[in-house]
Amino acid sequence: MPLITVGINHKTAPVSIRERVAFAPEKMIDALSSLISENKANEAVIVSTCNRTELYCSVEDLSKVDDVIAWLGKYHGIALPELQQYCYTHADDDSVRHVMRVASGLDSLILGEPQILGQVKSAYAVSQEGSCIGPELESLFQRTFSVAKRVRTDTAIGENPVSIAFAAVSLAQRIFADIRNSTALLIGAGQTIELVARHLKENGIKHIIVANRTLARAQILADELNAEAIMLGDIGDYLSQADIVISSTASQLPIIGKGMVERATSQRRHSPMLLIDIAVPRDIEPEVEEVNDAYLYTVDDLHSVIEENVRARQDAAKAAEQMIEEGVDSYRRVVESRKVSDLIVTFRQSAEAIKNTELEKALKGLEMGQSPEQVLNKLAHGLMNKLIHAPTRYLRDAGADADQDALIIASNVLGIYEEKDN
């Protein structure tokens, strides 16, 4: 059956549109069931993240793509003309290629981002839970996960951070070989600090302290991550606990000065402290780098790392694209092989039916007292005539049409030339 993809992502639509077509996790199975029960698709998987909503479907024919787009608009209450201007579609090989690129991080806002593979796997699992996936998409997604794993394993696509937040956490991991026993003090509660916090949590940080000018905002983030919230004015009392300090506020004046860091390192008995200032203007006085056992990095230091890593990821992406093309070819072979398998099964079933019919005639002949020799003769002739009927008709039609290619194929299939040689 044909495969189609209908999607909207960060390249085609602003967040104001993307949020309107997003699917709530708790309603995903109902949405999938609706899509299938309304006969828009036979199988479906929906990937819905902050940057994309994509519907992967196995359908009766490619004309169903219009039905799927119409269903998406109806489900979310968006007029079809408005929705269509933001949608993109793929079919068959292009659909296979697209899902493999998505799962491998090649279609992401941040090239090579690792989270998307987990999100695609979760979408697949939800579809399985709702019994909305069958042999077509099962095969596609298993092949996709295999290709994405190979891309992750055999290229450097995910080894080099390309966001400020990810770069900051990666730097911390380089300096502290194991951050699972470390405490991080995060100053600010904006999007960048939120991403930093999530990256730290994903990498097993022991404890996070969130400091913000507004305690309520810090508490919201702290509650999400099982962290501790404090006011900016309390930083001096907590700084000595921090192995890692990452700051990103909108303050026009430095929040951490040299003297504060000197007192903290003294209380820490000169255990190393990493400070990463990703604010503009700076949150941490430049003189802090003069303090023994304090290691200060700025946003410019991270940008240089990111630029190098973007280039490295682009090189890795070239190798990844080749792996994806190999994956598309491999999947195509599986599909074609499945078609041949179905044909073989049908052919064998036809032969089995002929055998049973002729065998039944033979048994009746024996019951009626016919000699075994006579029965076997009729059985052999009956089998021969029925088995060669369709090939004989094909050969006559090909001969009448002077279709030499068909005659050559038929002779190879029937083994006629081999018989002459033997």
Curated annotation (Swiss-Prot):
<dbReference type="InterPro" id="IPR015896">
    <property type="entry name" value="4pyrrol_synth_GluRdtase_dimer"/>
</dbReference>
<dbReference type="GO" id="GO:0008883">
    <property type="term" value="F:glutamyl-tRNA reductase activity"/>
</dbReference>
<feature type="binding site">
    <location>
        <begin position="113"/>
        <end position="115"/>
    </location>
    <ligand>
        <name>substrate</name>
    </ligand>
</feature>
<dbReference type="Pfam" id="PF01488">
    <property type="entry name" value="Shikimate_DH"/>
</dbReference>
<dbReference type="Pfam" id="PF00745">
    <property type="entry name" value="GlutR_dimer"/>
</dbReference>
<feature type="binding site">
    <location>
        <position position="119"/>
    </location>
    <ligand>
        <name>substrate</name>
    </ligand>
</feature>
<feature type="site" description="Important for activity">
    <location>
        <position position="98"/>
    </location>
</feature>
<feature type="binding site">
    <location>
        <position position="108"/>
    </location>
    <ligand>
        <name>substrate</name>
    </ligand>
</feature>
<keyword id="KW-0627">Porphyrin biosynthesis</keyword>
<dbReference type="Pfam" id="PF05201">
    <property type="entry name" value="GlutR_N"/>
</dbReference>
<protein>
    <recommendedName>
        <fullName>Glutamyl-tRNA reductase</fullName>
        <ecNumber>1.2.1.70</ecNumber>
    </recommendedName>
</protein>
<dbReference type="InterPro" id="IPR036343">
    <property type="entry name" value="GluRdtase_N_sf"/>
</dbReference>
<comment type="similarity">
    <text>Belongs to the glutamyl-tRNA reductase family.</text>
</comment>
<comment type="function">
    <text>Catalyzes the NADPH-dependent reduction of glutamyl-tRNA(Glu) to glutamate 1-semialdehyde (GSA).</text>
</comment>
<feature type="binding site">
    <location>
        <begin position="49"/>
        <end position="52"/>
    </location>
    <ligand>
        <name>substrate</name>
    </ligand>
</feature>
<dbReference type="InterPro" id="IPR018214">
    <property type="entry name" value="GluRdtase_CS"/>
</dbReference>
<keyword id="KW-0560">Oxidoreductase</keyword>
<feature type="binding site">
    <location>
        <begin position="188"/>
        <end position="193"/>
    </location>
    <ligand>
        <name>NADP(+)</name>
    </ligand>
</feature>
<dbReference type="InterPro" id="IPR036291">
    <property type="entry name" value="NAD(P)-bd_dom_sf"/>
</dbReference>
<dbReference type="InterPro" id="IPR006151">
    <property type="entry name" value="Shikm_DH/Glu-tRNA_Rdtase"/>
</dbReference>
<feature type="active site" description="Nucleophile">
    <location>
        <position position="50"/>
    </location>
</feature>
<dbReference type="InterPro" id="IPR000343">
    <property type="entry name" value="4pyrrol_synth_GluRdtase"/>
</dbReference>
<keyword id="KW-0521">NADP</keyword>
<comment type="pathway">
    <text>Porphyrin-containing compound metabolism; protoporphyrin-IX biosynthesis; 5-aminolevulinate from L-glutamyl-tRNA(Glu): step 1/2.</text>
</comment>
<comment type="subunit">
    <text>Homodimer.</text>
</comment>
<dbReference type="InterPro" id="IPR036453">
    <property type="entry name" value="GluRdtase_dimer_dom_sf"/>
</dbReference>
<dbReference type="GO" id="GO:0050661">
    <property type="term" value="F:NADP binding"/>
</dbReference>
<dbReference type="InterPro" id="IPR015895">
    <property type="entry name" value="4pyrrol_synth_GluRdtase_N"/>
</dbReference>
<dbReference type="GO" id="GO:0019353">
    <property type="term" value="P:protoporphyrinogen IX biosynthetic process from glutamate"/>
</dbReference>
